[in-house]
Regions:
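Extracellular/periplasmic helix-exit of transmembrane alpha-helices
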Residues: 70-80, 228-229, 252-284
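Membrane-water interface regions at transmembrane-helix termini and the short interhelical loops
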Residues: 123-130, 145-167, 178-182, 356-365, ...
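Hydrophobic transmembrane alpha-helices that form the core helical bundles
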Residues: 99-131, 141, 310-328, 364-367
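Juxtamembrane transmembrane-helix boundary signature
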Residues: 34, 61-92, 101-113
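Membrane-interface "cap" regions at the ends of multi-pass membrane proteins
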Residues: 1-43, 206-208, 233-237, 241-248
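Membrane-interface loop-to-helix entry segments
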Residues: 151-184, 198, 373-380, 400-412
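Hydrophobic alpha-helical segments and their helix-loop junctions in multi-pass secondary transporters
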Residues: 169-197, 207-225, 383-395, 416-427
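Transmembrane alpha-helical segments of multi-pass small-molecule transport proteins
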Residues: 128-153, 169-180, 337-356, 378-387
Length: 428
């Protein structure tokens, strides 16, 4: 196995050890973390609802969202290995205004997203526990965030890196099994079922929300760059290994989005039941309909899939937003390096703020989550352009990647303008 020295120094001035080229299990980390974070919000809720409401029709939008966002997520990995810095540091170099925009969005998203996924995880855990336990969703949410907090504060990145790989293996295995079982015994369509069409302006908000977090909000690329930086310092991975990790994580996330769409199609599409749109009510309905279709024995299987989705997303959101906000704070204060106390503070902020949202604003959580998804899509062209321009300034992109990136910006920008025009009443 050959070795080489890292060309770019660490952003914090650390001296990195000798790199080892080649394939091993240890190279996987940031890509798997991103996939774990993505699956909870966009996949379990939005993808499954898309299948339940419109069958296979919106599969093309899921594919297009993944295809056209790919280069801008990939640039996070490229930028870290090219410069030794996070994307957030790159935003700060371009303009403090970009840093402030990202910081404000991240502060809001941290508590809304963490609160939403924690509440869903708590509700699903309640489905799995015997009725005799008698714990409320709030109590279960406190238990979940306490586990996440101690896990992240005590173990930091290394422990998170190791555990999420096993979470992803369990999640993928259980999801594939659940979909295969549902495909073998799909819901029988009612005789008078009339398929609804999503291709109208009235459905545009749903499609934008679906694509906003598909596979994740584009500002999550900056969080991925924080994980990539931590992985690079911990294991001194090469650029090629980092890209392999990213590509595997992104591909797994994209494929699972279609599997969750299939779950909605096989279990709910054409059943004649009105599909719930609120996240908590929808998960309850999905589990009950899956059980009614497949059999009572399958309740724990689909509940386990749902819980692993949300628990994995909860812990990765808390860590990711904690790291991103700590990096923003470091750059705003002009400090040389990020420290564990700052990460611990902002991780606690995400978890504690999310818990406060659950406690006092649980009734508005669905609206907040939809707002977060839509705002993520509207801001996607901005962060896409930033990521593209940062990487382009450091290395010459191939003609194919350059054209691909421009096509992605046109797609994201065009859809955003269409949605804003519809919202303003200019069209429709």
């Amino acid at each position: 196995m050959t070795t080489q020295r890292l060309n770019n120094p660490s952003a914090t001035g650390d001296t990195l050890p000798v790199q080892q080229e080649g394939f091993s299990w240890r190279i996987f980390g940031p890509g798997i973390l991103m996939a774990t974070a993505a699956i909870g919000g966009s996949h379990l809720i939005s993808s499954t609802q898309a299948g339940a409401l419109y069958g296979w029709q919106l599969a093309i939008m899921i594919i297009l969202a993944n295809v056209f966002k790919y280069p801008f997520f990939r640039f996070a990995t490229d930028y870290v290995y090219d410069t030794g810095e996070s994307l957030i540091a790159g935003y700060a170099k371009r303009s403090k205004a970009y840093l402030w925009i990202y910081f404000i969005l991240s502060i809001l998203s941290a508590v809304i997203s963490t609160g939403a996924v924690t509440l869903l995880a708590a509700v699903i855990l309640g489905f799995m526990l015997p009725a005799s336990v008698g714990l409320s969703s709030i109590s279960l949410a406190v238990i979940i965030v306490a586990i996440c907090w101690f896990f992240l504060i005590a173990g930091h990145y290394k422990l998170l890196d190791g555990v999420t790989k096993w979470i992803m293996i369990a999640l993928v295995s259980a999801t594939v099994l659940a979909v295969m079982i549902a495909a073998g015994k799909p819901t029988v369509m009612v005789a008078d079922f009339v398929p609804a069409s999503p291709w109208n302006l009235a459905t545009l908000g749903f499609i934008v929300a679906l694509m906003g977090w598909m596979p994740a909000p584009l500002e999550f690329a900056a969080i991925t760059s924080m994980w990539t930086s931590a992985k690079r310092k911990a294991d001194n991975t090469t650029h090629r290994q980092g890209l392999l990790d990213f590509n595997v994580g992104f591909l797994v996330s994209a494929i699972l989005a279609l599997f969750f769409l299939a779950l909605g199609v096989f279990v709910q599409y054409g059943s004649g039941q009105e599909i719930q749109t609120a996240g908590v009510a929808y998960i309850d309905q999905l589990i009950n309909m899956y059980t009614a279709t497949i059999g009572e024995w399958s309740r724990l299987l689909v509940a386990f899939v749902a819980f692993m989705c949300m628990f994995g997303t909860t812990i990765t959101c808390a860590d990711g937003y904690g790291r991103a906000n700590a990096e923003c704070w470091r750059l705003l204060k002009g400090e040389d390096e990020i420290n564990k106390k700052q990460i611990a503070f902002w991780t606690t902020y995400a978890i504690g703020g999310g818990l406060l949202i659950i406690t006092f604003f649980a009734g508005q959580l669905g609206a907040m989550l939809k707002f977060a998804m839509i705002s993520a899509f509207i801001s996607a062209p901005i962060f896409g352009w930033l990521n593209y321009s940062l990487v382009k300034n450091h290395k010459k992109l191939s003609a194919g990647m350059n054209a691909y990136s421009i096509a992605g910006l046109i797609f994201l920008g065009g859809f955003t303008l269409l949605f804003l025009a519809s919202l303003a009443g200019i069209i429709g």
